[in-house]
Amino acid sequence: NLEPLKSHTVVGLDKSCDDGSSDDMSTGMRVLSGRGAFAKFGKPSAAQAQPQPPPPPLGMMHDTNQYQCTMDTIMQAYNPHRNAGGNTQFAYCFN
């Protein structure tokens, strides 16, 4: 689902963002690209073209774990009845 959307936006929208006109947005995308689903679907072609974005694999794994932590915390906040599972994952995250 995300794959065709990404290749579609890379043509125009994503390029304007990557031009460097908005550095904050670029940084945000770089942070997102190392976490969760964006690690796979977030502008891989742009990451290869620019020497800036690619993070070290170890840091990427750590960021992914960090994101998983945040995601589970958010899910716990939105689903209080899922409390026990959220707490287990939360403890596992910060081990």
Swiss-Prot record:
Query: A cellular component term (GO) from this record?
Result: nucleus
Q: Which UniProt keywords apply?
A: Developmental protein, DNA-binding, Homeobox, Nucleus, RNA-binding, Transcription, Transcription regulation
**Single GO MF descriptor:** RNA binding
Location in or out of the cell? Nucleus
Organism domain of life: Eukaryota
Just give the chief location class: nucleus
Stretches the record annotates as Disordered: 1-29, 42-63
> What does the record give as the function of this protein?
Bicoid is polarity protein that provides positional cues for the development of head and thoracic segments. BCD regulates the expression of zygotic genes, possibly through its homeodomain, and inhibits the activity of other maternal gene products.
Q: Which family does it belong to?
A: Belongs to the paired homeobox family. Bicoid subfamily.
In its UniProt entry, what is this protein called? Homeotic protein bicoid
Supply the source organism for this entry. Drosophila subobscura
Which classification does the entry list for the species? Eukaryota, Metazoa, Ecdysozoa, Arthropoda, Hexapoda
